[in-house]
């Protein structure tokens, strides 16, 4: 069954409501984004996530020390890294927490992914332009070749998630803007989330 992460949660009401829909993971963004929240706010929201749901903090730490501080203060299950942090720094962080490394999908994506393979637990394939679909053919090739779980992101929504899973065959899918109230970044549409989870989970 496909692993599903609902990302970009920004408020307490949505944490509680989304948790009831039972995704596999909930993500909080500290990196530059319309859904960015402060460390203190993330700390409070993370406490609301039930133990049955994995928590993910999305960040761009400048070095391992900064990442370790985030881990210490927030205690997430995963740290999702969205910058080109040096491999030596990622290796240090990997001794403290499970890491998801985001990779922008382009013709060089697999070569880049291979450099991190020994030091992370999973890869997230994202679009260069946030909230848009990328080349799923490249993603499918990466998912097939990677020795680690691959999570597909970038422009997913309830309408295209089944096709995306069918074509790419990822370990998991990640959605943020595709399940929001139109024009309100960070505010989730629960009907869209319900449909997204149901459709992703029904795919075999």
Model features per residue range: what roles?
Residues 1-125, 129-204:
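Conserved N-terminal beta1-alpha1 strand-loop-helix module at the mouth
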């Amino acid at each position: 069954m496909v692993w599903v992460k609902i990302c970009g949660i920004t408020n307490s009401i949505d944490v509680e409501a989304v948790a009831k829909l039972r995704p596999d993971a909930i993500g909080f963004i500290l990196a530059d984004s319309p859904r960015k929240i402060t460390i203190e706010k993330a700390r409070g929201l993370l406490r609301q996530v039930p133990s049955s749901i994995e928590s993910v903090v999305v960040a761009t730490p400048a070095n391992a020390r900064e990442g370790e501080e985030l881990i210490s203060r927030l205690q997430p299950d995963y740290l999702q890294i969205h910058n080109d942090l040096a491999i030596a720094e990622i290796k240090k962080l990997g001794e403290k927490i499970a890491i998801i490394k985001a990779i922008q999908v382009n013709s060089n994506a697999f070569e880049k992914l291979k450099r991190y393979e020994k030091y992370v637990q999973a890869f997230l394939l994202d679009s260069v332009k946030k909230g848009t679909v990328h080349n799923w053919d490249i993603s499918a090739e990466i998912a097939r070749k990677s020795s680690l779980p691959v999570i597909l992101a970038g422009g997913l929504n309830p309408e295209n998630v089944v096709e995306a899973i069918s074509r790419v065959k990822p370990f998991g899918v990640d959605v943020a803007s595709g399940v929001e109230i139109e024009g309100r970044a960070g505010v989730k549409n629960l009907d869209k989330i319900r449909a997204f989870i149901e459709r992703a989970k029904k795919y075999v």
